[in-house]
């Protein structure tokens, strides 16, 4: 039996139509859910507030209760914090140090520095610290210093700048830079009823901050040496006197040039 072409085409079309109907029936159905609106979110947010006003609290938003001990500590902190905030911050305006080892409150050291830097303080050693402390203890008890260890004839006056020593230069002497051409001369009377004086000079070779004081104890005045000059002093010097054998300048000679004495009218 022979089929013509038209019959075959009709059969193919019918089979394709059945296939399309079958495929549409077997596809999954998609259900579209409605999108929530903003008004719905607002109503959900307002629900806890409305429940609080109505007296019905949501158990999920209830805060945990504190134990009695924690509650007391919180109350104490709340009471302390306002008082602390109201109290003013202390300000340090003055600092006063009182200690035996403080160098700025040591009167003995202050006196040592003063005697070292002051050119009008006679060069001499002070008493040991333990002796000076005994002096102070005696003064605190009796109101006066003890007589032991004091000179029976103390210095009558403080040292003064009496004049200068001018270096004598010989023609054959080589030039030296470490010997100054002039040196300040200081003197102080040994005691009130004496005609002897203590003399000293200041080392100015290097122009340092600390100028050393050199006592003139072993000098020769016009070729004459005086014994025990460190205890009793030497006779008063006058203009034109020649001094040599100074400990600082042993090979040099100096002539004395005194300042004029000011006379009151």
From Swiss-Prot:
It comes from the Viruses. Its main location: host cell. It is a single-pass membrane protein. The chain crosses the membrane at residues 1-21. One of its GO terms (cellular component) is virion component. It is found in: Host membrane; Virion. The keyword Ubl conjugation does not apply. Keywords: Glycoprotein, Host membrane, Membrane, Transmembrane, Transmembrane helix, Virion. Glycans are attached at residues 74, 142. The keyword Glycoprotein applies. This is Uncharacterized protein L330. It comes from Acanthamoeba polyphaga mimivirus (APMV). The lineage of its organism: Viruses, Varidnaviria, Bamfordvirae, Nucleocytoviricota, Megaviricetes.
């Amino acid at each position: 039996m022979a089929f013509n072409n038209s019959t075959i085409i009709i059969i193919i079309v019918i089979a394709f139509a059945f296939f399309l109907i079958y495929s549409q029936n077997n596809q999954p159905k998609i259900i579209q859910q409605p999108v929530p609106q903003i008004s719905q979110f607002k109503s959900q947010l307002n629900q806890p507030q409305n429940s609080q006003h109505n007296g019905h609290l949501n158990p999920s938003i209830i805060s945990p209760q504190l134990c009695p001990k924690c509650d007391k500590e919180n109350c104490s902190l709340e009471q302390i914090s306002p008082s602390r905030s109201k109290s003013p911050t202390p300000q340090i305006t003055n600092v006063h140090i009182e200690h035996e080892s403080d160098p700025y409150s040591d009167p003995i050291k202050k006196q040592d520095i003063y005697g070292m830097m002051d050119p009008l303080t006679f060069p001499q050693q002070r008493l040991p610290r333990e002796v000076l402390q005994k002096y102070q203890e005696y003064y605190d008890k009796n109101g006066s210093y003890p007589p032991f260890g004091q000179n029976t004839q103390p210095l009558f006056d403080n040292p003064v700048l009496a004049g200068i020593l001018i270096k004598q230069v010989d023609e054959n002497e080589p030039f030296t830079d470490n010997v100054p051409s002039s040196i300040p001369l200081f003197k102080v009377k040994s005691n009130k009823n004496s005609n002897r004086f203590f003399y000293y000079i200041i080392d100015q070779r290097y122009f340092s901050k600390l100028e050393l004081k050199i006592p003139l104890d072993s000098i020769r005045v016009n070729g004459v040496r005086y014994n025990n000059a460190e205890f009793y002093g030497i006779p008063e010097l006058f203009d034109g006197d020649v001094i040599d054998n100074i400990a600082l300048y042993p090979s040099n000679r100096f002539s004395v040039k005194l300042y004029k004495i000011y006379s009151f009218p």
